[in-house]
Amino acid sequence: AQEATDYLRSMFGGQYQTLKRVAIHAVDKQYAALKNLVDTALIPEYFHDNFRHELWHLLNGHYNEFSSDQKNKVIEIIEGLEVVDEDKSVNARATAYKRTIWLSAIKDYSDRTIELYKKYTTITKAEPKHPDFSSYMTSVWVEHKSPIPIEHLLTLSVDSLVETINNYKDTGRGWLDEP
């Protein structure tokens, strides 16, 4: 077990995002043996779109097993997330949306997490979709609205935004039938 821990620790310390994602996934799937690496995964760098799938599942599956300090650290990181506009001002609604994404993983674990989740969904007026979905879908058409919520687009890094736009498939059905 020590060899696995040491190897995963080196993956966390490496330069490649893919290896860091694999390390987070391993901690999630082998939590009992690797829980001593949780602190390594609880850093602001990983509360980002590129790590969303793996970290969200780690939080969702094991937050209740974290120490009080680890739980507080997660909340502190989430509360510190901000989305800024081009003019460098904080976009309150996009920031709230980004926070709800992470809070959705832990919202059912305590009154505090439920309260924070409700606070931010009140601001966004929407609950985030499950992180396993790479795009957002709806069966409701809203006149003159983008098929991808602006709050979601504002939370994306440049690379994620380009990927989201490039992966969008126009069905040719027009706005009425678009997601």
Task: Show the residue positions of the predicted features.
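Non-catalytic all-alpha helical scaffold/repeat segments
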Residues: 1-179
